[in-house]
């Protein structure tokens, strides 16, 4: 009976995992609304969870497992499920549109309309912007509540700032184009949220009690660390990052949103460039400015990607987008950009445009994937991508259209540079407000009231610069650049970023190259991994101490370099860099090296495993984006919960990657020499020790993310593919600590094999969802 009950529990949980995984895959093809209704919203899905909970509770009681400290953790999960079930039964979600000055007391949920017990009136709506830009920092609705049962009150609703009244919670959701109205999300779920949050609190309490009082866990943790202080380091970073995010998200001015800086028409060229775009058959290397002069242009400020940054940043992004790297024929990114601006005829035949792999290369008959700008026109002077783009528009393109779209983007990016529309370097006050600045390019439509001399300076300035560049009068050219910089300082001194931030960004542009560090880390890790495996298998003597010391020194150097890159990006962006895939992978590499350095003496394989884990993380960061652009934080990301959520999740993934590499070593030892039982058991003990904090951190990261989602969107769980796979990962790895229920996993080799297979869940959670399945957490877009 006991064995049958255990099998039934395992089958039930297995069916739940299979359902969740299948739903995320089907969502990609069938769409989110269908999956939300047919699976997540179906009563059989709710019943499956209830059945799992009841069977598990019955099994725990029959096995008398309630006498253990871990019982608190199981009760916490039961309370969380009860909260979710309560939300399923009683919660109400909808939308309310507010128009300025019009009292409203109704909101809609689907096709149904619901009445509030009070009236809300929007008195004023405003958008705050990051200083000197048109990038929104927050959307704020000022409202007055007229309640017949309570005193009238006023309040505000903004991103990550909820307005609560008599069980109803209001969240900022959308704005009207005229800025005289907004849409609020309305949530009424007092019981479900309260019960779920109690479950989160009980879960945290259970974890703390388990780590502090469970004798078996404390004995295991001695293998890894005298004190688990290492786990507090990323959380401290998250706390500091939260403060940084809060400060960075405080807007410095309020204004009506200005129109975009430039209408990026890509079909025009300024007078200075029209003749230069003539056909040139020259085979000489592309002409450009000297390195020092081009670098001076890089010190100018430019309005780019909704932020004020050095022109050097634009040059690096331009070079990366075109060539896939940060140079061409020994020229710097600034020289490449200046070459296209001042000497385009010398560049149109240079094969520096990297085409994506696939069918797009066949259109150009390119073998190595590198083409010139001229090759985008065929022998009839027709745009080579015109037909494929039309096929894509009609949905008739035979294959993945991303390659064609990427190539088209590169072509038009060059046009935007040669037409000077990308160069918004001239700041002008907007509406007589010294902090409301618009940045103009030489070809933008300038304000009618602009004085004649200043208008000529902006409109004809680059013609003069082009003339000096062609003449080779670099002294005069440098002086002209200095005048533009003085103009920027005079007109935009209150909104320009601090000098230290600009210096940090310029240095970051030059140093942020994760690819060579990734290969170095992987090479060192593979060498150490092979030496240690051979030593444990008996093929080599014990690893000499000097090898460990050299490896430790290299790890410290690599950690210092990565720390510097992260610090520079943090300073340049004014918020903790944990908001995209490359950032989180860089952080994971940093964590891997930090843990390996601090605890390698207590666990010998930790150093090679740390190098390998860091190397893979850095390689993914390099493949994703060698130098991800620095951007302003989206308003919804300006929450102190974000950094804590990401830090916990990434630390958990780092520890789980350690376990997978540990298991890899154990399996190799088993294959190479069957007389390695002691070493395999030692690796198993280490993995079990690491597994507990990894699971706890993953669980904490998930429920911090749920709280953040509830604060931002009014729903603490929405079955987004990323959060669903994070839950799957937690459930799969949790089996590794339930050796009483799954006795086979108490044996070292089955445990190692299971842990290695379980790591596929981490890979799917991060890479599969981010780049394939999509969702709110996806970086695929």
Label each residue range with its predicted role.
Residues 1-781:
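Solvent-exposed, non-transmembrane regions of integral membrane proteins
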């Amino acid at each position: 009976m006991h064995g049958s009950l255990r099998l039934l529990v395992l089958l039930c949980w297995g069916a739940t995992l299979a359902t969740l995984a299948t739903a995320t895959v089907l969502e990609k093809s069938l769409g989110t609304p269908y999956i939300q209704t047919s699976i997540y919203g179906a009563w059989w899905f709710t019943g499956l969870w209830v059945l799992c909970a009841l069977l598990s509770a019955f099994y725990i009681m029959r096995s008398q497992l309630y006498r253990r400290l871990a019982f608190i953790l199981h009760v916490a999960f039961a309370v969380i499920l009860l909260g979710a079930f309560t939300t399923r039964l009683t919660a109400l979600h909808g939308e309310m549109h507010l128009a300025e000055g019009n009292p409203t007391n109704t909101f809609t949920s689907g096709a149904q309309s619901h009445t509030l017990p009070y009236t809300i009136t929007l008195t004023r709506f405003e958008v705050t912007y990051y200083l000197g830009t048109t990038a929104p920092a927050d959307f704020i609705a000022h409202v007055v509540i007229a309640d017949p049962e309570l005193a009238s009150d006023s309040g505000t609703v903004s991103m990550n700032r909820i307005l609560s009244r008599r069980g109803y919670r209001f969240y900022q959701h959308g704005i009207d184009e005229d800025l005289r109205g907004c849409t609020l999300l309305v949530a009424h779920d007092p019981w479900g949220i309260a019960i779920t949050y109690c479950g989160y609190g009980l879960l945290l309490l259970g974890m703390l009690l388990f780590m502090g009082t469970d004798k078996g866990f404390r004995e295991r943790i001695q293998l890894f660390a005298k004190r688990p202080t290492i786990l507090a380091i990323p959380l401290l970073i998250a706390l500091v990052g939260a403060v940084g995010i809060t400060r960075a998200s405080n807007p410095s001015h309020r204004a009506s949103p200005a129109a975009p800086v430039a209408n990026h028409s890509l079909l025009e060229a300024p007078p200075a460039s029209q003749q230069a775009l003539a056909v040139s058959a020259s085979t000489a290397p592309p002409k450009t400015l000297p390195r020092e002069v081009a670098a001076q242009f890089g010190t100018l400020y430019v309005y780019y990607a909704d932020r004020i940054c050095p022109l050097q940043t634009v040059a690096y992004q331009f070079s990366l987008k075109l060539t896939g790297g940060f140079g061409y024929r020994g020229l710097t990114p600034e020289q490449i950009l200046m070459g296209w601006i001042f000497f385009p005829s010398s560049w149109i035949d240079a094969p520096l445009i990297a085409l994506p792999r696939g069918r797009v290369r066949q259109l150009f008959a390119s073998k190595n994937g590198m083409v010139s700008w001229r090759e985008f026109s065929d022998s009839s002077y027709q745009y080579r991508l015109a037909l494929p783009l039309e096929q894509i528009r009609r949905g008739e393109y035979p294959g993945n259209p991303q390659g064609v779209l990427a190539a088209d983007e590169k072509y038009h990016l060059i046009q935007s540079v040669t037409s000077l529309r990308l160069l918004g370097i001239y700041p002008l006050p907007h509406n007589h407000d010294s902090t409301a600045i618009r940045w103009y390019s030489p070809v933008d439509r300038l304000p009618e009231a602009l004085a004649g001399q200043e208008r000529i300076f902006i409109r004809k300035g680059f013609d003069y610069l082009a003339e000096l560049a062609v003449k080779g009068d670099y002294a005069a050219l440098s002086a002209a650049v200095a005048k533009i910089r003085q103009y920027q300082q005079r007109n935009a001194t209150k909104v320009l970023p601090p000098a230290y931030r600009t210096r940090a960004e310029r240095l970051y542009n030059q140093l942020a190259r994760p690819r060579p560090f990734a290969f170095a880390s992987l090479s060192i890790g593979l060498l150490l991994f092979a030496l240690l495996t051979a030593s444990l298998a008996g093929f080599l003597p014990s690893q000499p101490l000097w090898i460990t010391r050299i490896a430790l020194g290299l790890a410290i150097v690599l950690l210092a370099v990565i720390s510097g890159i992260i610090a520079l990006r943090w300073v340049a962006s004014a918020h903790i860099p944990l908001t995209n895939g490359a950032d989180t992978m860089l952080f994971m590499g940093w964590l891997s090296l930090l843990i390996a350095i601090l605890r390698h003496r207590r666990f010998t394989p930790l150093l090679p495993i740390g190098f390998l884990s860091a190397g893979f993380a850095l390689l993914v960061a390099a493949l994703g984006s060698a130098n991800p652009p620095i951007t302003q934080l989206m308003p919804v990301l300006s929450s102190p919960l974000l950094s804590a959520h990401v830090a916990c999740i990434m630390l958990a993934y780092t520890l789980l990657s350690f376990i997978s590499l540990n298991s890899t070593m154990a399996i190799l030892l088993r294959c190479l020499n069957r007389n390695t039982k002691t070493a395999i058991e030692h690796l198993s003990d280490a993995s079990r020790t690491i597994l507990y904090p990894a699971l706890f951190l993953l669980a904490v990261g998930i429920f911090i993310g749920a709280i953040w989602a509830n604060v931002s969107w009014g729903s603490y769980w929405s079955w987004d593919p990323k959060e669903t796979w994070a839950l799957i990962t937690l459930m799969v790895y949790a089996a590794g600590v339930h050796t009483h229920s799954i006795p086979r996993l108490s044996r070292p080799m089955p445990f190692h094999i299971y842990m290695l297979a379980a790591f596929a869940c981490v890979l799917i959670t991060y890479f599969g969802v981010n780049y394939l399945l999509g969702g709110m957490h996806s970086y695929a877009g």
